[in-house]
Amino acid sequence: MRRLNRQDEPPAGLRRYRHGRDAWSAVTPEERMAIWLSLNLMQGPRCAYCDGPMGDGNRHIEHFRQRGRYPQGTFDWSNLFGSCNRAGTCGMAKDQCGAYSPETLIKPDIEDPDVFLLFTPGGTVRPRAGLTANNHLRATETIRILVLDGALNQIRRAQLCGYIQTMEIFADYAEAYPDDDSWVEELEREVRDTAHLPYATAIRHVLTRQSE
């Protein structure tokens, strides 16, 4: 999960629909493609929740607040994200987990998940230390509702193996040459170069040793 910047202008065609009058199924394939173009500008080809890869056949337009419980958000641009189709996680899990308070979930286009969540070299995710009781609850519930642990832990662990070695190289150099901080620029470049990759948040947390 990572901070997303949503553009203000809704996708073409979305404004002509109204909840209570139109069904979500009425949105045409061309209009859905326009929604995806706008979602791609915001989040690229990565799931808004797990940060994993998405593609045709492995994604769906996700209503942050479910249509069944919040029908007035059906055509609200601020309520739409792109989610992967991985069974048992992300949007699929959220829509099957039962009732919960929508205000509990971290909404990545208005909040920075980095404030709440910490990814470890082992692939796990947990609430950050030092959170207020309310924010700790929100972090815990976001992990639970979206099932950001479980099977995703193993997937992230596999992605992180090489970056753990890179982090250890930087750490060894910093310890061996405490007066030489040239490695810092190299580390920052590595973080920038991986920012577009799947699970980039977990990679960044490992490279910058945030779990220590």
Feature locations, PLM:
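Short, charged surface segments at domain edges that flank catalytic/cofactor-binding sites
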Residues: 2-46, 70-75
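Alpha-helix initiation and capping sites
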Residues: 41, 74-78, 111, 133
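Beta-strand-connecting loop/turn residues
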Residues: 45, 57, 122-124
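Short, surface-exposed beta-edge/turn micro-motifs
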Residues: 45, 79-80, 114
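Histidine-centered nuclease catalytic patch
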Residues: 49-92, 98-100
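Conserved, surface-exposed functional patches that form binding/active-site neighborhoods
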Residues: 91-169
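C-terminal, charged low-complexity interaction regions
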Residues: 133-212
